[in-house]
Regions:
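Short active-site oxyanion
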Residues: 85-89, 140-141, 248-251, 308-311
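Cysteine-centered metal-binding/redox modules
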Residues: 1-50
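Conserved Lys-Pro-Asp/Glu-containing loop-to-beta segment of HAD-superfamily phosphomonoesterases
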Residues: 139-145, 294-317
Length: 341
């Protein structure tokens, strides 16, 4: 490979470094005057990309709420009812209340929640909804959580409620000894749709913007700058997909840099918790518009490498494939398609 000169006549996609070289140093301008040794070293650094990961994720389907409910009703509950009489369902806050509510409704049983006394560190059961009939308190309570990972929570529940049933819809093999029942063994790694966006993974995650935090911009709006800026300022958000509790590494978007103020104001208005906003260079607009999927996909992949991000949440499958091709180390999450790879 020839490192004796810069091979790019202008800012754009560089096939030597396999990244977008803009006019901002140390990219395209830097390369004009760099020594062969500097270019070769930069190539090695660029190719190295992300070499460290928290945990290698396989490809798979994102586990959806509908999967959680189906497993609770059709796999877990029949196992329990074959051997026990149940007089109530106790949902373990917070996400354990999701399957618990559906199971209680399906069986027409009272729904309870679990509360903890902070002063005494003891647990008690609180009634949330009665059944339509007159259920006698005969049999056992079914304590239900969505997932069990280490088994510590279920172990504590067994100590507090030794005469009742402790269960989880999904459980790791490690947690099984502390459960009476589980619907399905689910060893990691995996992604759960109902908690991913505020899970510990988010600190190592970068996000696409349009199509993830809000609907994609309609084509007719893109062609009219007044409509476009109004859209950026006022588009409704997908609140359930926004990192709020844990700060995301970055938001990386194909929007042009000149719309930064509008974009930052919208992100602030919607309480998105992120560290950096990376936007597409204004001077590469024509190149972007000729082949948006490839150019923006590569630009995102390049910045994901620089951020050392483990996950990238992308709205478009076609762009996601480009990102994965350019950066094999990142796990690309596609919530609109229900998959990650």
């Amino acid at each position: 490979m020839d490192f004796s000169k810069c091979h790019c006549p202008k800012p754009g996609m560089c096939n030597i470094f396999n990244k977008v070289m803009t006019e901002v140093p140390p990219n395209w301008q830097w390369c004009q005057n760099a020594t062969p040794e500097e270019r070769e070293k930069y190539k090695q650094t660029s190719d190295a990309g992300v070499q460290t990961r928290l945990k290698k994720f396989p490809s798979g389907d994102i586990i959806q709420v509908v999967d959680l409910i189906d497993c609770a009703i059709n796999k877990l509950t029949p196992k329990v009812l074959r051997k026990h009489k149940i007089f109530g369902i106790v949902g373990i806050p917070r996400s354990g209340l999701i399957p618990a509510a559906y199971v209680a409704e399906a069986l027409d049983l009272p729904l309870y929640s679990l509360a903890q006394h902070k002063s005494s560190n003891t647990n008690k059961v609180i009634l949330l909804k009665r059944s339509s009939g007159n259920n006698a308190s005969v049999g056992k309570l079914l304590f239900l959580d969505d997932t069990s990972s280490s088994g510590r929570s279920s172990e504590n529940l067994k100590k507090s409620f030794p005469n009742h049933i402790i269960s989880s819809v999904f459980s790791t093999s490690k947690a099984l000894p502390n459960l009476d029942y589980c619907g399905k063994i689910l060893d990691g790694p995996h992604i759960l749709s109902w908690n991913f966006f505020n899970s510990h993974h988010i600190k190592n995650t970068a996000f696409d913007l349009d199509g993830v935090f809000c609907p994609n911009v309609p084509l007719d709006v893109c062609k009219d700058d007044n409509k476009y800026t109004n859209y950026l300022a006022n588009v409704e958000s997908y609140h359930y997909r926004m990192p709020k509790v844990v700060k995301a590494k970055a938001v990386i978007t194909g929007r042009l840099e000149k719309y930064r103020n509008l974009t930052e104001a919208w992100l602030k208005k919607n309480d998105v918790n992120y560290d950096k906003l990376i936007m597409f260079p204004n001077e590469l607009r024509a190149e972007r518009d000729k082949n948006h999927q490839q150019i923006v996909g590569r630009y995102k992949a390049e910045n994901i490498k620089l951020l050392n991000a483990n996950f990238f949440v992308e709205s478009e499958m076609s762009e996601a494939k480009v990102i994965k091709r350019e950066n094999e180390f990142v796990t690309v999450v596609c919530p609109n398609n229900g998959v990650y790879f």
